[in-house]
Amino acid sequence: MQNNKNKETLEIYVLGDDFKYYENLKYLPLTSYPSNIQSALIVYSLRGTAKISVHEDVHWIQPDELIILLPGQFVSFSEPSEDFLTVTMVISSSMFGDALSGVPRFSPHFFFYMRSHYYYPQNERDVLRIYNYLGMIKDKVMSTDAYRRELIIHLLRYLYLELFNAYEKESMLVNTRKDTRKEELANKFFSLIMKHFKENKDVAFYADKLCITSKYLTMVIKIGRAHV
């Protein structure tokens, strides 16, 4: 991908309803008030600043910063500066699920971790890597390859694995814990959320799927948060 810091023309490339790639996007496809997002977003800030909140964490986006948002998070976006521009990818919940399906085991604690670890400042070396990475994805979206969806999924999976690897390293420094019955339930709970969060947001629905009470599931979720 060419350096677009001095270009302002908005470019949009799509892959059906699954994937949208925006170059030089100023206003992120988010509301100015906290709302539950249905898609995953990967945002790279080219220049300028803007305010973003994920759950209760507020952050001012800076130039050369990578923002990672996951489906189901409560997010708001506001106050972009006059010169704010981004490269933004919007990934459907279906495609996001397919990207994670190739990962051996995503701990549910990772999703809590990402509530406060969603922005990543990039150094000079990182910026070159990010431009190469974004360029590969853009090339695949624009191509006529028969398996371009699968190729994009693999590229997305690479990024999510890098994030999960960083999370695991940090977790190991804090605690070396074995899987327990509660953690196994938490894993299953988050798998169900990925499948059903659009149509079901009631704890009772997930408790019924797991054959436990709503009260016990709430306790399991609280324990998961305590580990993050």
Label every PLM stretch briefly.
Residues 61-74, 90:
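Conserved metal-binding segment of the jelly-roll/cupin
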Residues 2-14, 80-139:
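A hydrophobic/aromatic-rich effector-binding and dimerization subdomain
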Residues 64, 217-218:
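Short hydrophobic/aromatic patch on the recognition helix
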Residues 41-44, 129-133, 155, 159-162:
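Amphipathic, well-ordered alpha-helical segments in soluble domains
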Residues 51-53, 75-81:
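Short beta-strand His + acidic residue motifs that chelate non-heme Fe in jelly-roll/DSBH
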Residues 1-62:
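Generic protein-terminus/edge-of-domain signal
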